[in-house]
From Swiss-Prot:
The gene is BOA8. The chain crosses the membrane at residues 471-491, 504-524, 542-562, 587-607, 618-638, 665-685, 742-762. One of its GO terms (molecular function) is FAD binding. Its EC number is 1.-.-.-. The lineage of its organism: Eukaryota, Fungi, Dikarya, Ascomycota, Pezizomycotina. It is an enzyme of class 1 (oxidoreductase). It comes from Botryotinia fuckeliana (strain B05.10) (Noble rot fungus). It is found in: Membrane. It comes from the Eukaryota. This is FAD-dependent monooxygenase BOA8. Its cofactor is FAD. Pfam families: FAD_binding_3 (PF01494).
Length: 779
């Protein structure tokens, strides 16, 4: 992932080295995001030859990553272009950039490797200068790149747009693309024209845009010579109050480092400071004792520096991206802090989207597009990119503040939450990249679909499901719980019927059988990676205890509600997020047998009512606590391979989960059949509910047996409604192709054959199998 472009002192410019690199290097080497479409020219793909008769010409202002990428994209569509670069070098050294493919995002996490397995592209680290050289070298026509062109102003009318340079030269085209960075002349000129021609609504948005540029943080970044203890391929982050560091060990042994610090105050627009040469020395003196990794201090990194620069980190979101024939891209329109490393990736996406949109304005008859067509195309570009880009800007800026411990909440997150969520950065990074823009004229690269999180335009940041909508769909579950609460009555007292000892034991066994499906499923969900920090992950034991105390019919619908709202399929877009903890998965079958069959056998073999009652009250009533303790203790004696399996075998837990589901199904089916054979009707067994401990002298079957049956029907009705909601999710994202007729048939047939508990487990096990398969969304 690329850090945002930063200006550097002219003395740090390096000479143009376009022809000094080996020609075999591929542009794909520089891009970790699988959807990026700029690649080394492929002989199998013909690039349209641009001539003086091209339908459209784009004047690209700025030879930045955004500008050069846009040139590549336009060439694929046969759209003519010219690039005007202010500097005399296309590739000055203005900062370090991406990640090494063997890097570790934190010293104890292998998140970059996981990201590579998910996306199909490993994370690559290289200097921004190198990427610019590669982009330049592979341009079909380098004569279209003009350096030393400082743009002064622009003009546009219904026929063309004109760029006027400081040296008096003029360049006309159908579109002007502003890729000239944070201090964009094109953006300023565009705003000037909006102020003249805009509506009241446009002017209101313009006022907000004019105060959008701000800076609250600064960055001292540079390159240093190798230091013992900082290995090649490793990445180190450190956080402190008001300051954080990021350091990469490059493949050449050099260290690429960043020191992010909070300014004394937030400044806006023209008030943002511009540091001069020498300011970095005074600034770094305050942080010499800051640890960058283990016992290594920033002072040692600074002492070994090769080059360094000190800049203010601007932040900016804009409402206006285009006006008539003018549009901006890259840092000129969406500027973020570099901690998340998404600045250049965002610029590349904007370039691809702008080219896609402009291509839609091309006419079949070869004539030039009208101003209305150009305006519509650029508006489409804004519409498709604005939301996603601004969400990434917000995420990056927030991440900077978390690392700088800006607030108490940021301190808590950085110190206690993030360290316990080793893959949170991999999740954020993959979420940002998986749904990124694709250049429509090129086929999807095979690698983009080979990872465990295949590319999809329906996934990623900005494409999340609406939680309010999910809550509305799950609202009937809360209504069922409220109905049970309002209708809850004391132990029935009317027309008591004394039961035999065998009937009492049957009541106890049916109570155990009724809990097995919920205990099994809820426990599995609590160990699922994609459910991290959800109610299902944090409170499974509490829900099971409340079910024992208040009744499963009251508690289960509440659990179902929270689980459905907090566990959409987007949480499991990566196959490894379906994975459960391997150590837990291995011991769960034994836990089910011990916790459920143990008390059941003791109750069934009891010869005295008092003994059965004691077992029920103690060994069974507190089973959620025993189950949790059993799993937590035995986890330490079983080898946990989750960290490796999440990368190399995300279905490693599946065989163990199948055993657990099968055992639960067999136990529930056996209890169901035993109840059917031991009572005059199987309905009596089906309608048992989890009750408070039965009195040792007699068991009561009150006059409200019909109400109990209704409760059980509603309980499993809620359970199956919850299950069908999740199957609807699977069908919506395309993971399940089965018809609703088949889904309902399996649920009903398994329920009638072996009871509702079996039906519920069968459906959940089926869902497990579907989620374990990789799904590729067709283009």
């Amino acid at each position: 992932m690329f850090n945002s472009t930063m200006d550097i002192d002219p003395h740090l410019r390096v000479r143009e080295r376009m022809n000094q690199r080996k020609q075999s290097r591929s542009i794909y080497h520089s891009i970790n995001d699988k959807k990026k479409t700029i690649s080394r020219p492929n002989p199998s793909i013909n690039i349209a030859i641009m001539t003086q008769t091209s339908q459209m010409k784009v004047v690209i202002v700025g030879g930045s990553i955004a500008g050069l990428t846009l040139a590549h994209c336009l060439s694929r569509y046969g759209i003519d272009y010219i690039i005007l670069e202010r500097r005399h070098d296309i590739a000055p050294q203005v900062g370090a950039s991406t990640w090494d493919e063997n890097g570790r995002l934190l010293s104890e996490t292998d998140a970059p490797i996981l990201t590579g397995k998910r996306l199909g592209y490993t994370i690559t680290f290289l200097e921004r200068e190198t990427l610019l050289e590669i982009l330049y070298r592979h341009l079909p026509d380098k004569s279209k790149v003009l350096t030393g062109k400082y743009v002064r102003s622009i003009e546009q009318d219904s026929k063309e747009a004109v760029v006027i340079c400081e040296d008096g030269s003029r360049y006309s085209g159908d579109v002007i693309a502003g890729a000239d960075g944070i201090h964009s002349t094109i953006r300023s000129e565009m705003r000037r024209q909006i102020a003249k021609e805009g509506t009241t609504k446009d002017l209101e948005a313009l006022k907000r845009d004019e105060i959008a540029l701000s800076a609250e943080y600064s960055c001292l970044f540079g390159i240093s010579k190798p230091i013992p203890g900082l290995e090649i391929g490793h990445t180190h982050r450190s956080s402190g109050k008001g300051a954080s560091t990021l350091l990469f060990g490059g493949v050449d042994g050099k260290l690429y480092w960043f020191l992010f610090t909070k300014n004394e105050e937030r400044t806006f627009g023209d008030g943002i400071p511009r540091y001069k040469k020498g300011d970095e020395t005074n600034h770094v003196a305050k942080y010499m004792h800051h640890h960058v990794s283990g016992n290594i201090l920033l002072s040692e990194v600074w002492k070994n520096r090769i080059v360094a620069n000190f800049v203010t980190i601007e932040e900016m979101e804009n409402e206006h991206w285009n006006w008539n024939r003018v549009a901006c891209l890259g840092d000129s329109i969406h500027k973020m802090t570099p901690n998340l490393g998404q600045g250049a990736n965002c610029a590349i996406e904007s370039a691809a989207e702008m080219a896609n949109s402009l291509a839609k304005a091309l006419r079949d008859d070869g004539s030039k597009p009208a101003i209305e067509d150009i305006n519509s195309a650029l508006s489409l570009y804004h519409q498709k990119r604005n939301v996603r880009a601004n969400l990434i800007v917000k995420a990056a800026n927030k991440f900077t503040r978390v690392e700088a411990l800006a607030t108490t909440g940021d301190w808590v997150a950085s110190m206690f939450i993030i360290p316990r969520l080793g893959d949170i950065l991999a999740d954020r990074g993959a979420k940002v990249q998986v749904g990124a823009t694709k250049l429509d004229c090129l086929p999807m690269p095979k690698r983009a679909l080979e990872g465990t999180m295949p590319w999809s335009t329906n996934s990623g940041i900005g494409k999340e499901e609406n939680r309010k909508r999910r809550a509305q769909l799950a609202l009937p579950l809360i209504l069922i719980a409220l109905w049970f609460f309002w209708k809850k009555t004391p132990e029935p007292k009317g027309f008591p019927v004394t039961k035999t000892f065998s009937e009492v034991k049957l009541d106890m066994l049916s109570s155990i059988a009724n809990a097995i499906p919920f205990a099994t499923i809820w426990t599995i969900e609590s160990y699922r990676r994609g459910n991290a920090l959800t109610v299902a992950n944090i409170f499974p034991t509490a829900f099971l205890l409340l079910a024992q105390k208040l009744g499963i019919e009251l508690v289960a619908p509440i659990y179902f509600f929270f689980h459905y709202v907090q566990s959409p399929q987007e949480n499991f877009a990566a196959l490894d997020n379906r994975l459960t903890n391997i150590a837990f998965a291995k011991i769960l079958p034994l836990a089910i047998l011990s916790i459920f069959l143990g008390p059941s056998y003791c109750i069934w073999s009891s010869i005295e009512l008092e003994s059965a009652q004691w077992i029920y009250d103690n060994a069974w009533y507190w089973y959620p606590v025993y189950l949790t303790m059993f799993l937590r203790i035995l986890k330490f004696i079983v080898k946990d391979t989750t960290r490796l399996n999440r990368i190399y075998k995300p279905t490693a837990d599946l065989s163990y989960l199948r055993i657990s589901y099968s055992i639960s199904i067999l136990i529930c089916a056996a209890f169901y059949l035993y109840g059917s054979l031991s009572s005059s009707t199987s309905i009596a067994f089906l309608t048992q509910e989890l009750q408070p401990p039965i009195q040792p002298i007699q068991a009561i079957l009150g006059a409200f047996s019909e109400l109990w049956a209704a409760k059980q029907t509603s309980l499993y009705g809620a359970a199956f409604y919850w299950t069908f909601l999740h199957f609807a999710d699977l069908k919506f994202v395309g993971k399940s192709k089965q018809s609703w007729l088949l889904i309902l048939t399996i649920x009903l047939s398994s329920t009638f054959l072996a009871g509702p508990g079996v039906g519920l487990i069968v459906m959940w096990a089926w869902r497990e199998e579907i989620m374990a398969k990789k799904h590729v969304v067709p283009e």
